[in-house]
Amino acid sequence: MRTRLFLASCVLVSAVPAAWAAGGAPMSMPSMSTSREQSPEDQAKSAYNDGVRDVRKADRFDASATELTDAKKKEKALREAHDHYASSLTKFMQAAKLDPNMHEAWNYVGYTNRKLGNYDVALAAYERALALHPGYPEALEYRGEAFLALNRISDAQQAYLDLFAANRGLADKLLTAMKGWIDSQRTAASGSDATAVDALDKWVQERAQIAGQTAGLTREGAASSWR
């Protein structure tokens, strides 16, 4: 509830477009600065960097949980992931409060909320990040995965198409997430409508074929062909 109230209040803050730094990477900080000397922007960067360190730990535990077969170890890894996602969310929210124009922080507010199952709150944060930095690839990909979780298939497909034109690597990541979603829906007792799942599966296969056929046209594909 506090998260929703915080996001709702921050949406009212006027947005000034911000320049994009490396996605997900820690931000550089002034040397020899103390918390008393730091500007709100520097304090925001510090909170953001702390959040990045925490979210990376969460991701490692989350990835580990998918590989574990022992029930107790899996449960422990998931609990650790949850706790680190919650901790990092607090830090990213603090960063966004100190610097409402930091789209990187808003993107991670969305990411951590999505990992915690707060999909509607996550979407609001992604929208904030994209309002500050239109076309921001990381937010488009993360938002696409949130659309999947909410069964908003056409929105997830559009997110993929937007990424396909701008960032093939993240487009591939979203397509992989779609494949995982399809598998999970087919194995779930109360999954989505079978016709809709089959239609998405066909679409994913078609898009994967197109991606493979055009891989050499991208900068990364051209570089790979010369190795």
Language model features by range: what are they?
Residues 24-35, 165-227:
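Terminal, low-structured helical/coil segments at or just beyond the last alpha-helical repeat
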Residues 108, 142, 176-177:
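Canonical tetratricopeptide repeat
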Residues 56, 115, 149-150, 184:
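Register position in tetratricopeptide repeats
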